[in-house]
Amino acid sequence: MGEKRTIIKALKNSAASHFIKKLTADTSLSSIQEAINVVQQYNATDPVRLKLFHTPRMVSQGAHFAFCLPTKKPHYKPLLLSQNALDEFNLVQDQDLEKILSGEKVYYSDSIFPYSTVYSGFQFGSFAAQLGDGRVVNLFDLKDKCSGQWQTFQLKGAGMTPFSRFADGKAVLRSSIREFIMSEALHSIGIPSTRAMQLTLLPGTKAQRRNQEPCAVVCRFAPSWIRLGNFNLFRWRHDLKGLIQLSDYCIEELFAGGTQFEGKPDFNIFKRDFFPDTETKIDEQVEKDETEVSTMTGDNISTLSKYDEFFRHVVSLNANTVAHWQAYGFANGVLNTDNTSIMGLTIDYGPFAFLDKFEPSFTPNHDDTAKRYSFANQPSIIWWNLQQFAKDLACLLGPEARDLELLLKGELNSVDDALEKTMIERVQKLVELSANEYKYVFTTRYAQIMSQRLGVDLDLEKCMSSTNLKDIEHAAEKAKEFCDVIVEPLLDILQATKVDYNNFFIHLQNYKGPFFIKDKSDTATLFGAFDEEYLGMFFNSKQLQQMAETEEAFAAGEKVFDANGELRLLNEKLQEIRNWTQDYLTLVPPTETAARASLAKKANPLFVPRSWVLEEVVDDLMYSQRDGLQDPSSELDTSALKKLYLMSVNPYDRTKWDVTLRPELETKWADLSHQDDAKFMMQASCSS
């Protein structure tokens, strides 16, 4: 376990700040000592200090970050602390911890000083030049006790930085609650994500959005906050030195000097497209001249440089995360390149949502009228972002070993037409191989998660991690067959019948009865062949009643009128359900109910924070307790918020939801049978 420690002790004995140690500061303040001198010589309202730490500017060529500080606020009131996160660092809760994690107190030393990073980004497909941490201040790095991995702590909503542009540096309470809860929820489900440590209300601080709103600060942490947008910046700047610095930092510091790239299959295996008919639309996003074929031709890539391996690894990490999103029905809402993590983490929570119903075209982003970032488009959009990343790295991916060595030494003074052609062809080949590997990683991981959710043991994990061609072929074949025969037909049914997406899997895992109760020849309609409880997973009560009445009418020899064709559609779905159930039972026989449930329970969260639940909790604070939010001495009722946190971070274990705390909310939020359908599939704006 390790001995519990105070935050001050942890910072003095074991903290670091790797980003500022290895990378380049803006020349306005080029060292930690210069930044410390500003703090010691000028008070918080002095124009010199305000200009250096809190005034937007274009930073110097080659800069990766700028030193800055959290803006001092009149009042701070911690609302929620993630005990799970606290335990991962063996930290005790005390006043110093609360103050440092809110920005009220700032820790710095000769090797640590707060900073904000600079990056660019493709936003809704269009390039935006210098962006950066406009309201985020990075604090320090600490190792977590489980993996021994360094985690970078930062404050979101910490005030103006050199990268705030035209914004105010604030984060409203509404979006802060949403990010805190959802980031911890995704992590607890098993979806790669950044984390949250503390949520702090800022009484007396408001932000003008559509209306004036109360503000908050979220302390969050991750192994790295570097995004693809950090690399977009250096392509735009034509800054090779800065690009190499950033790439080397990622390889050495984030991926253990490249040792994490080991154990992958021969890259040339992915000259073959193992999923040529995939519906993830990746093929449409591969920018090349030739028509896509199932197997690439041409010479193999003989050796991979560390930059090739780096690109390949980032592709795989992101493919894995998107597979989790699609399997669990998580819609990100905004997937710009500056919202795409170099480590494949779910990052920068905005207008996100879990699907209430399976609707692939749904976007939780009210402002995404073209549905660029719809649920169905997420795999292809992430691949599009990765292609921009390939362009950022092109000058490092294109050269063969000898030319790359000259480039890194600064001795590749010119590139003739022949070398340029060779370099372009090599980058194109790497991108094509990566496209096929992206589809392979995405589809096999997606099939593996979906099979678990359905209680089916496909035994894919071993093959997925193998470097053997036969194992890779086997994994691809099993994944494709499972998706074609089981997953896609099921999703078609769920999309048509519009039952709750997540709870369908819960109901199926808990079902112990017979799937069929009669042969179809013994019933008036197909409806009578099914167990009604089983059908209740696929249809709502109104649809079930319609089908039951039709069954009775046919049995009595009465005519049934179907004026709007609804009964015909229901009967078509019944036929599809029968076919699907028969296929499903070949994988999980009815006699294996216990084994099916045991496997599924490990992959099916009993609760996911829906948009309407988050809105209820936000409204409880923002409207029911409006006056108290601005009074630092008021006692706020945070019981609903704490209940939501407990349910979100313990998605597989109802016993940890604390039955003594607002027990009525468990039924209200987790059992949706009595909920108003109008609450579902809510959208949010980008305003935060």
Swiss-Prot record:
Effect of loss of the gene: Reduced growth and survival in presence of oxygen reactive species.
Major site of localization recorded for this protein: mitochondrion
InterPro entries recorded: SelO (IPR003846)
Source organism superkingdom: Eukaryota
Presequence positions on this chain: 1-23
GO biological process: cell redox homeostasis; protein adenylylation
Record's catalysed reaction(s): L-tyrosyl-[protein] + ATP = O-(5'-adenylyl)-L-tyrosyl-[protein] + diphosphate
Gene Ontology cellular component terms for the protein in this record: mitochondrion
Catalytic center residues: 338
Compartments reported by the entry: Mitochondrion
A Gene Ontology molecular function term of the record: metal ion binding
Keywords carried by this UniProt record: ATP-binding, Disulfide bond, Magnesium, Metal-binding, Mitochondrion, Nucleotide-binding, Nucleotidyltransferase, Transferase, Transit peptide
E.C. numbers: 2.7.7.-
Post-translational modification (record): Forms probably one or more intrachain disulfide bridges.
Names of required cofactors: Mg(2+)
Main enzyme class: transferase
Binding site for ATP: 132, 134-135, 156, 168-169, 220, 227, 348
Note from the entry: Present with 2430 molecules/cell in log phase SD medium.
PANTHER family: PROTEIN ADENYLYLTRANSFERASE SELO, MITOCHONDRIAL
Role summary: Catalyzes the transfer of adenosine 5'-monophosphate (AMP) to Tyr residues of target mitochondrial proteins (AMPylation). Involved in redox homeostasis by regulating the cellular response to oxidative stress. Regulates protein S-glutathionylation levels possibly by AMPylation of deglutathionylation enzymes such as glutaredoxins.
Family, similarity comment: Belongs to the SELO family.
Name of the protein: Protein adenylyltransferase SelO, mitochondrial
Annotated organism of origin: Saccharomyces cerevisiae (strain ATCC 204508 / S288c)
